[in-house]
Amino acid sequence: METATLVTISISCLLVSFTGYALYTAFGQPSKQLRDPFEDHED
């Protein structure tokens, strides 16, 4: 394979992995540990 193809595939895999991890952190099991500043604020 050519170098450009390998670089493109590597960057694409990295981007998909990062997006999947971000979605898992935002909506998956770790999201229960996140605090909501709007709920913490009292009027």
From Swiss-Prot:
Protein family (similarity comment): Belongs to the PsbN family.
Membrane topology: Single-pass membrane protein
Record organism: Pinus thunbergii
A Gene Ontology term for the protein's cellular component: chloroplast thylakoid membrane
Protein's name in the database: Protein PsbN
Subcellular location: Plastid, Chloroplast thylakoid membrane
Residues annotated as transmembrane: 5-27
Pfam families, per the entry: PsbN
Main subcellular location of this protein, as a coarse class: plastid
Domain of life: Eukaryota
Keywords, ordered alphabetically: Chloroplast, Membrane, Plastid, Thylakoid, Transmembrane, Transmembrane helix
Function, in words: May play a role in photosystem I and II biogenesis.
The keyword Ribosomal protein is annotated on this UniProt entry: no
InterPro entries in the record: PSII_PsbN
A GO biological-process term: photosynthesis
